[in-house]
């Protein structure tokens, strides 16, 4: 009877140690991403998410892999999920704004960057990117204000300033 108990405990502990964690899948996915294996990265990000359904970083990084494959709508779904988990994650709004920009949804870009700026008022990149979308929407005054604010925060917004502020 003791042998059976030891065997059971040994098998149970092997099963526990053999389980891959969400972080391990994330690390594997990041490696695949940098090796330009986007499909493999997406598979591993998905495995990380199955283990931890609130893993914001996995959603954001999977979105980036989808974006790299030009699956902008799929990327937006992942970024939106990250935002649902943490509505104050400014980088997730930035990520989603970039994907919306690739789909020429400049109004959506402005909304996302406005929210990112509400969360982090010193987010220079958000001001710059929002300014670019305002430029495409024909709002030169808004584009110029955002470009000047981005520049004041350290972003090189000189090209946008030349186009929007003259």
Locate predicted features.
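Alpha-helical tetratricopeptide repeat
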Residues: 2-166
């Amino acid at each position: 009877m003791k042998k059976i108990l030891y065997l059971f405990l040994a098998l149970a502990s092997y099963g526990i140690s053999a389980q891959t964690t969400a972080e391990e899948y994330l690390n594997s996915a990041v490696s695949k991403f940098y090796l330009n294996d986007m499909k493999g990265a997406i598979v591993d990000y998905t495995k990380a998410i199955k283990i931890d359904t609130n893993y914001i970083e996995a959603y954001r990084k999977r979105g980036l892999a989808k974006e790299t494959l030009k699956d902008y709508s799929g990327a937006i779904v992942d970024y939106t999920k990250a935002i649902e988990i943490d509505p104050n994650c400014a980088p997730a709004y930035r990520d989603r704004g970039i994907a919306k920009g690739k789909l020429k949804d400049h109004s959506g870009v402005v909304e996302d960057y406005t929210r990112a700026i509400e969360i982090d008022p010193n987010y220079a990149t958000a001001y710059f990117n929002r300014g670019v979308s305002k430029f495409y929407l024909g709002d030169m005054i808004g584009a110029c204000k955002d470009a000047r604010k981005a520049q004041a925060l350290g972003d090189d917004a000189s090209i946008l300033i030349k186009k929007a502020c003259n």
